[in-house]
């Protein structure tokens, strides 16, 4: 132990202790007889202010505060996949077994990784090899989907003095020894890393490949790149959680980390019930084999909301360093900000806007800055990414409040949820007028190369139609649609088609829940062909009424495509497109 002090004051999750000379910021302290875990957030002389991550009921002045000399850290190694942890990375399933209670007992200590479970280790490095931070020295097939790569920790480099042969080992077994110029360092299957310190990498890259999610409005209208950042703000009942769950279920990421930060417990229960039954659309294996859940629900200690966000992003960086694309989903960062506000108030800090601490923007920036696509440290060379999608819950749907407005400064994709769309049963309720994505130009080349060379052009036409429809809506409200020209009436017709056939998506329909990029492009092609051909006929003097008499019957078929055509039956969409073109061609001949 690094020393101990005495508690002099208890104020909710904030404990003040004297006699803490030589303590460091963010050092872990165990408070009271129950040894409740806390973290030092302020030091004044030999007095430390400790943010305790468990309920402090019964802690009284005079009790001891034990310094540990270490920062709040997580265990990184085989056994994380498919696990459900609390905000301190304690495994909730094993805690339930040990305490025989539905609630987490205060002061309980259970390691994140199971100590007795044996893993089949295949070494890939040899004795005498020169190793440096990030080098892969062994592999473990953790699940059918994830090959866990054992990497040299960032602070270790030297000559591999010894490495264990292929066989079964626990995470505590020493599998290698590295000679660091006379100092021999033992390596186990797991390593520890402080959650507040970003893990190092070789080089940060520009994100150019889209993170495909199977949600059409996300992939096509407001795409996120691998290594990108996105925010989903929305008022109560607008569909934030279902949208985030859809991302977690269907996204192309190899590893998904879902952090439930201060949200309702039944939402995490939902995840645990659904994920084992669902199959990953990219591999056909159970989704839980690539998912890690961090549950810090609304009835758990407020202070641990902050640690749950950091625990999630540190685990994401670890899998990024192995060469995987990771998606971190956080629901919701507003609850974390509320925890910062409460603790700031208890520490008597000067409040800023709406009572939030003045350092809220810098904390949000630190968090989002840990996203990115990188070249990982070590050999062999590999690319990994951490993409972050976070919900924001502004009170009353006010996007000008501090958490939303500050988040907007740091994210490059904005998916605002509109309660009026949700009430109209339009899901996902992402407002296509307010939303934006800074990755459209970066990912366009991927779409052109792999899906459709006219993707950017078609998307631009769809977006222009939606923007023009928003302008026309005001005129229609005042004087009715009859006063509009045929060109503008066609805009209204096409925008209705875009909304019903493309933007709306049923997250609970077996076929519509996930749209492959090829299916998305083909549905977009149908709408694009409908609009551009009708527009040409209007230019040649035909009336919209005459055009719709001939081709209007195709509209219900275009809308039904998303429900009736599976991702491997796309030739049916081509057949419909050919029939549509034939109908337009016959109209063109009549005009001629």
Curated annotation (Swiss-Prot):
Gene3D superfamilies: 2.40.30.20, 2.40.50.100, Bovine Mitochondrial F1-atpase, Atp Synthase Beta Chain, Chain D, domain 3, P-loop containing nucleotide triphosphate hydrolases. Pfam families: ATP-synt_ab (PF00006), ATP-synt_ab_N (PF02874), ATP-synt_ab_Xtn (PF16886), ATP-synt_VA_C (PF22919). One of its GO terms (cellular component) is proton-transporting two-sector ATPase complex, catalytic domain. Its EC number is 7.1.2.2. It is found in: Cell membrane. GO terms for biological process: proton motive force-driven plasma membrane ATP synthesis. It is an enzyme of class 7 (translocase). It is a peripheral membrane protein. GO terms for molecular function: ATP binding; ATP hydrolysis activity; proton-transporting ATP synthase activity, rotational mechanism; proton-transporting ATPase activity, rotational mechanism. Keywords: ATP synthesis, ATP-binding, Cell membrane, Hydrogen ion transport, Ion transport, Membrane, Nucleotide-binding, Translocase, Transport. Its main location: membrane. ATP binds at residues 234-241. The keyword ATP-binding applies. It catalyses: ATP + H2O + 4 H(+)(in) = ADP + phosphate + 5 H(+)(out). The keyword ATP-binding applies. Coiled coil: none annotated. Produces ATP from ADP in the presence of a proton gradient across the membrane. The archaeal alpha chain is a catalytic subunit. Component of the A-type ATP synthase that produces ATP from ADP in the presence of a proton gradient across the membrane. The A chain is the catalytic subunit. Belongs to the ATPase alpha/beta chains family. NCBIfam families: ATP_syn_A_arch, PRK04192.1. Has multiple subunits with at least A(3), B(3), C, D, E, F, H, I and proteolipid K(x). This is A-type ATP synthase subunit A. It comes from Sulfolobus acidocaldarius (strain ATCC 33909 / DSM 639 / JCM 8929 / NBRC 15157 / NCIMB 11770).
């Amino acid at each position: 132990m690094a020393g101990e002090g005495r508690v002099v004051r208890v104020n909710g999750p904030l404990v003040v202790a004297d006699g803490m000379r030589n303590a460091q910021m963010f050092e872990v302290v165990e408070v009271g007889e129950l040894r409740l875990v806390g973290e030092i957030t302020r030091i004044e002389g030999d007095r430390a202010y400790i943010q305790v991550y468990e309920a402090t009921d019964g802690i009284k002045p005079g009790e001891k505060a034990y310094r540990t000399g270490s920062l709040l850290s997580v265990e990184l190694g085989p056994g994380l996949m498919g696990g459900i942890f609390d905000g301190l990375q304690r495994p909730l399933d094993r805690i339930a077994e040990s305490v025989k209670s539905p609630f987490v007992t205060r002061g309980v200590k259970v390691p994140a990784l199971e100590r007795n479970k044996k893993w089949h280790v295949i070494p890939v490095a040899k004795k005498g090899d020169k190793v440096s931070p990030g080098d892969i020295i062994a592999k473990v097939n953790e699940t059918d989907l994830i090959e866990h790569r054992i990497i040299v920790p960032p602070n270790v480099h030297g000559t591999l003095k010894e490495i264990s042969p292929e066989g079964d080992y626990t995470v505590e077994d020493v599998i290698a020894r590295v000679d660091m110029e006379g100092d021999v360092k033992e390596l186990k299957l797991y390593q520890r890393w402080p959650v507040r310190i970003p893990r190092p990498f070789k080089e940060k890259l520009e994100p150019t490949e889209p993170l495909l999610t199977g949600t059409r409005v996300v992939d096509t209208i407001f795409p996120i790149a691998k290594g990108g950042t996105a925010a989903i703000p929305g008022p109560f009942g607008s569909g934030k959680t279902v949208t985030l769950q859809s991302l977690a279920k269907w996204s192309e990421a190899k590893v998904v980390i879902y952090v439930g930060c201060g949200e309702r417990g039944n939402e995490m229960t939902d995840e645990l019930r659904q994920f084992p039954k669902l199959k990953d659309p990219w591999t056909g294996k159970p989704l839980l084999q690539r998912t890690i859940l961090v549950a810090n629900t609304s009835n758990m200690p407020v202070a641990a909301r902050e640690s749950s966000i950091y625990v999630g992003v540190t685990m994401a960086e670890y899998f990024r360093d192995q060469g995987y694309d990771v998606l971190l989903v956080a629901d919701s960062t507003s609850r974390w900000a509320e925890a910062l506000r409460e603790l700031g108030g208890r520490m008597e800090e000067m409040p800023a806007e709406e009572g939030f601490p003045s350092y809220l923007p810098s904390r949000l920036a630190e968090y989002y800055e840990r996203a990115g696509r990188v070249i990982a440290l070590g050999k062999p060379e590999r690319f990994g990414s951490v993409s972050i999608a976070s919900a924001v819950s502004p009170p009353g749907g006010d996007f000008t409040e501090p958490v939303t407005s500050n988040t907007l400064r740091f994210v490059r994709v904005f998916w605002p949820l509109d309660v009026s769309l949700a009430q109209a049963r339009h899901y996902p309720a992402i407002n296509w007028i307010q939303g934006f994505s800074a990755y459209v130009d970066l990912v366009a080349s991927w779409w052109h190369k792999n899906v459709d060379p006219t993707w950017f052009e078609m998307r631009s036409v769809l977006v222009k139609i939606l923007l023009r429809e928003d302008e026309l809506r005001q005129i229609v409200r005042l004087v009715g649609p009859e006063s509009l020209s045929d060109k503008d009436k066609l805009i209204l017709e096409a925008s209705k088609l875009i909304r019903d056939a493309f933007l709306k998506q049923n997250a609970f329909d077996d076929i519509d829940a996930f749209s492959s990029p090829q299916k998305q492009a083909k549905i977009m092609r149908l709408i694009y062909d409908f609009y551009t051909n009708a527009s040409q006929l209007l230019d040649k003097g035909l009336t919209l009424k005459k055009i719709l008499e001939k081709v209007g019957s195709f509209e219900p078929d275009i809308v039904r495509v998303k429900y009736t055509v599976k991702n491997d039956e796309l030739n049916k969409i081509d057949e419909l497109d050919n029939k549509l073109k034939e109908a337009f061609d016959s109209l063109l001949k009549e005009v001629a």
